[in-house]
Amino acid sequence: MVGVNQMLAGELNYYSPYYRQVTMETYTSDSLVAARMPLAYGDVRKSFEYYLNHYNHGRPFILAGFSQGAMAVVDLLNTMADSTYSRLVAAYVIGYKVTDMGAHIRPAQDSADLGVTICYNSVRDNSCALPLLSDGNLVAINPVNWRTDATPALLVDPRHGDTLTVTLDTTSLLLHIGGYTRDDYMLPLIGCEGNYHCLDLSLFSDCLRRNMALRANHFISIAPAALPKP
């Protein structure tokens, strides 16, 4: 939560729920995933409902989750009421996949569109993908230049100062990271060399923070009817 707080604290007002996450060992067995994930989803749904009833006060909102949290965001998108979705600024599904285009899932096309879903998974190349995280994904965008084509973007690693190249592969919908030479990214148990799942937040935290503010300001400027009355 320290990293999340650094990214979201300040001008952004955020609500982060406690919920029962499954262990990494769970992902080694499909039967364990099927048995345990409903508990996590149930906790997040209840927490989101509590947030709407006690903290949101009719305001527009952003959903954001990473990895297992991103799975929960997809679940919320697929189960929320239309009236709730009408106040959604954007949903950030980071380090996971969107495999079903439900009524409330619209892929982001640029940096400022609204009611959309942002999704990406970072790898060195396609051979480094983890099927659990990205197989069958239908939604992707480059979080540096906010394009959905293969136009590359330069990114300075906020932790080390290294200059990286970030390119969306439009066939696999994986985000290719060029120039990363460190070995501090391996995901325990199910990770592999060249899969940058553990960097999906830290590399792009500044990009995400700025984009959340941009989309929120855009929503407020064009959708005053969605704002609570004084």
What are these regions (language model features)?
Residues 28-59:
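Helix-loop module immediately N-terminal to the HCX5R catalytic loop
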Residues 34-42, 67, 198-202:
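Soluble non-cytosolic domains of exported or imported proteins
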Residues 13-18, 62-63, 90-93, 118-119:
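Structural recognition of the beta-strand scaffold that forms the well-ordered cores
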Residues 18-22, 65-67, 93-97, 123:
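Active-site-proximal beta-strand/loop segments in catalytic clefts of secreted hydrolases
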Residues 45-57, 78-229:
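Surface cap/lid and interfacial helix-loop subdomains adjacent to catalytic sites
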Residues 63-73:
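Gly/Ala-rich beta-loop-alpha elbow adjacent to hydrolase catalytic centers
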Residues 25-26, 71-73, 100-103:
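Extracytoplasmic/secreted cell-surface and envelope-processing proteins
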Residues 1-26:
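Active-site machinery of serine-nucleophile hydrolases
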